[in-house]
Amino acid sequence: MIQPQTHLNVADNSGARELMCIRILGASNRRYAYIGDIVVAVIKQAVPNTNLERSEVIRAVIVRTCKELKRSNGIIIQYDDNAAVVIDQEGNPKGTRIFCAIARELRQLNFTKIVSLAPEVL
């Protein structure tokens, strides 16, 4: 469960290292974001000499959460940290590599570019 003021790790090589969620997109009073949701975030830490800078406002897709994800077949998926992938306005990832295994639900939500870059789909 990601809510405003939650710090997120970045799971790609876009240039950001840590994000802070400032808004959850989708509804005006939505409280939590889960895997596959788009959030507006601000960059808290960035790699030097990259296109992204600290305090820049960006969009990101949640790919890992500490809160468990329950599937209809009874499988429960839970990660050790909260992480996101930086995207542009069209929903394409800004990075060229993704460093973690991601959930199958992202494919159903039409984030096929992110799924194709991931090393493993759970």
From Swiss-Prot:
Record has Lyase as a keyword: no
Keyword Transferase (UniProt): no
SMART domains referenced in this protein's UniProt entry, alphabetically: Ribosomal_L14
Pfam families registered for this protein in UniProt: Ribosomal_L14
Gene Ontology biological process terms in this record: translation
Subcellular location: Plastid, Chloroplast
MF annotations from Gene Ontology: large ribosomal subunit rRNA binding; structural constituent of ribosome
Complex and partners: Part of the 50S ribosomal subunit.
PANTHER family: 50S/60S RIBOSOMAL PROTEIN L14/L23 (PTHR11761), LARGE RIBOSOMAL SUBUNIT PROTEIN UL14C (PTHR11761:SF27)
Family to which the UniProt record says this protein belongs: Belongs to the universal ribosomal protein uL14 family.
Protein name (record): Large ribosomal subunit protein uL14c
Organism: Glycine max
